[in-house]
Amino acid sequence: MNTFICSALICLSWLPGFIQARVLTKKLTITYAKGAPDGIERDMIFINGQFPGPDLIFDEGDDVVINVVNDMPFNTTVHWHGLLMQGTPWSDGVPGLTQKPIEPGESFVYRFKAEPAGTYWYHSHSRATLLDGLYGALWIRPKENVPMPFTMISNSSDDLSAMERAAKNPQLLIVSDWSNFTSWQYIQGLVASELDIFCVDSILLNGKGSSYCPGQRLLESELSAYMNYAFGGANITDKGCFPFVESTEGPYLPGNQSAIPDHMWKDCVLGNGSNETIYVDPEEKWVSLNIVMASTMKSVVFSIDEHDLWLYELDGQLIEPIKYQWVTMLPSKRYSVLVKLNKTPGDYTIRLPDQGFSQIISGFATFSYKGGQDIGQTTPWVTYGGQNASDQGNGSGLTDLLPAPFPALRPRNTSDVFFVYNLYRWNAAYTWSLTGAAAMPVDDWAYQPLLYNPNSTAAHDKSLVIRTKYGQWVDLILQVGSKPDERQEINHVIHKHSSRAWQVGSGSGIWNYTSVDEAATLHPELFNFENPPYMDVFATSFEGPSWLIMRYQVTNPGPWLLHCHSEIHLAGGMAGVIMDGVDRWPTIPPAYAPNATGHYPLV
């Protein structure tokens, strides 16, 4: 190990951005073995022998060196979700774009600058193996004296000191959904049935949870009037899974339900897993819970009985704080909340239901005060099905969480170029297109990454690829509901690799403007150029045809993925490529040449 560190220090001088900074080295060994997070055993992925993987904590500006060893029987890569990767596109971890897969028995060294500060995560980006457990939390501690927005919460000096302490020492939490089927089995179920299956067995917190099978009567009582109407009288299953109807499958029915594996969609199996306990000390007065939403397909409502949540960071970006009683968390996003520890010391239930638009299911955990006593049942903010349980509660929804960044960050008022993406199903219920022109095949360019082939035919494929120039301001317009036979599109969560973007506008209907400037002039009420949200994951609406606009500046040349972070949608082709800054394509160091793996020669 000492030799490895020495070699890295010697060679870092010629890598962009790796000069005169602390170098931190980590080793992640990925294995495939039996495990039972919710009490039901299956094959799954472990990182350094644990699930989820170990928390990775760095200081802002650290130079990070991570040796990923693949001891699984199949290939993989690791993506560092939300990190900028300025000048290091070869470490973004996307097969076919920035690297070749890490084959069984081989390793790959990722090198990058720890920036920007905030809450992130790392996960697989090969096929759909996120379903198998390859993920972990990542936190970058901000530099000293960074302004924090806590005076918007309280003016008390005691509160402010406690909140600052809490933010510097957060508890990292990972919320995820879990299926008792491997990713291969799940995808085979989609293909064989020709149906879009989005059903899981449990909701986990820090890799712990269970399946509950509460009974048909309770499950049906939790359905909203909207969902009952959408189902047209069809019933949900005893797992809380939704029926195969036009509102869930589009025009691609009937499919072949008999090809769905037993227990994947119905016939609930009761688990015997254990739930997580989060311990807090009331003498600290406040705690920061930095939550990674590592789900593969579910949006989950997070709440702590009888406690308020002050959301102060979203997707790693500080925001003007918002007080909620529950927060709806979308796949791949990160939510940091401050919780005041002023209740009677005891155990309070953390509730983690699906938000009610894809399954009736819930997970649970315990929020436990040090020195607490038995206080009995605590009062919930939300129900098992994610519905409001109290007239006093207030929470965020699927698409209405659009906070202002802190401090204010403004994009340019105009852009240089815009691209329209039409998001919809692609010739089947379980395949998808991001661009509206093609579905992106899984691992299609895996062994010919576009980083090394920026002028190839694939890199000029306009059905999947856009090309920009350095310094341009770019608008990405995400349109849903544009297919005449499927006006009501499923909600999508779109992640942009590398730099964040501003959501500068959104509206209903079909985008039919010649420019964003024209749309903003005609409908100024639909746009925000003063303090728009600044994020790396964006949520489209499911309420009929609608559009939203992501704006960013090209400052980091490379091949970056734009994709839906529902894992089954990504596996079904919902992705595209942004070839940013093609006029200033990066020079690739020898350690990351086409057949290299990031290792330096030992000296």
UniProtKB/Swiss-Prot annotation:
UniProt pathway annotation: Secondary metabolite biosynthesis
Domain Plastocyanin-like: 30-144, 173-353, 450-581
Gene Ontology MF term list: copper ion binding; oxidoreductase activity
Annotated Cu cation 3 binding sites: 125
Cited InterPro entries: Cu-oxidase-like_N (IPR011707), Cu-oxidase_2nd (IPR001117), Cu-oxidase_C (IPR011706), Cu-oxidase_fam (IPR045087), Cu_oxidase_CS (IPR033138), Cu_oxidase_Cu_BS (IPR002355), Cupredoxin (IPR008972)
Record field: pH dependence: Optimum pH is 4.0.
Enzyme's top EC category: oxidoreductase
Carbohydrate-modified residues: 75, 155, 180, 235, 256, 272, 275, 388, 394, 413, 455, 512, 595
UniProt KW keywords: Copper, Glycoprotein, Metal-binding, Oxidoreductase, Repeat, Signal
Temperature dependence: Optimum temperature is 50 degrees Celsius.
Residues in the signal sequence: 1-21
EC number(s) reported in the record: 1.-.-.-
Pfam families per the UniProt record, alphabetical: Cu-oxidase, Cu-oxidase_2, Cu-oxidase_3
Record: residues binding Cu cation 1: 79
Annotated residues for binding of Cu cation 4: 495
Reaction(s) this enzyme catalyzes, per UniProt: 4 monapinone A + O2 = 2 dinapinone A + 2 H2O; 4 monapinone E + O2 = 2 dinapinone E + 2 H2O
Matches recorded under PANTHER family: LACCASE-RELATED, MULTI-COPPER OXIDASE
Function: Multicopper oxidase; part of the gene cluster that mediates the biosynthesis of dinapinones DPA1 (or (M)-DPA) and DPA2 (or (P)-DPA), biaryl dihydronaphthopyranones that act in concert as inhibitors of triacylglycerol accumulation in mammalian cells. The first step in the pathway corresponds to the biosynthesis of dihydroxy-decanoyl-CoA by the fungal type I fatty acid synthase (formed by ORF4 and ORF5).
Protein name stated in the entry: Multicopper oxidase MCE
Organism field: Talaromyces pinophilus (Penicillium pinophilum)
Top-level taxonomy: Eukaryota, Fungi, Dikarya, Ascomycota, Pezizomycotina
